Amino acid sequence: RFLSSKTRPDDIAVIIGNADYKKQGKDIPNVTPAYADAGGIKEYVKQALGIAEENIIFLKDATQKDMISTFGTGTNHKGRLFRYLVPGKSRVFVYYAGHGAPGEGDSNYLVPTDAEASLIDLNGYPIKTLYKNLSKLPAKSVTGGLEACFSGASEAGSVINNASPVYLK
């Protein structure tokens, strides 16, 4: 239970819990705690931040299409999130639990549940696009949290077979 906050009718949250990568028949391991983590964050934003249920975009197992329609593309930032907010008034909270993956060069991606590991540069959602589009929102503030590893490895195995993961001992 969290301390209650007054209701903030203009504030918005996007919460994504990507856990079930196997249902798409892809070669990416599941992220077991992602649903529970996203559910806990949803309760937090409702109780502690005062965000109304109808102002929460809650996505379980978001596909590339879901992420694009929510956050926009590299050339159009006016996705679903943009349309929810009240310019200059809305505070935006974004949370993602799921896989992250390295791409070519210095690029990193959120991994949609329908992604193919060998094609992550084509079907991942670029972190640079996420940050760029969030920075273009006419919001009062934007707060984000990414619960994802970008090493290319997970407890259940390699996310990206050709990646060279970094391990801490």
What is each of the regions a protein language model found here?
Residues 22-39, 43, 120:
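Glycine- and acidic-residue-enriched helix-capping/strand-helix junction motifs
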Residues 163-169:
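Short, intrinsically disordered, charge-balanced linker/junction segments flanking boundaries
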Residues 16-18, 61, 97, 147:
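Cofactor-binding loop segments of dinucleotide-utilizing enzymes, especially the Rossmann-like FAD-
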Residues 10, 68-159:
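Caspase-like (clan CD) cysteine peptidase catalytic core
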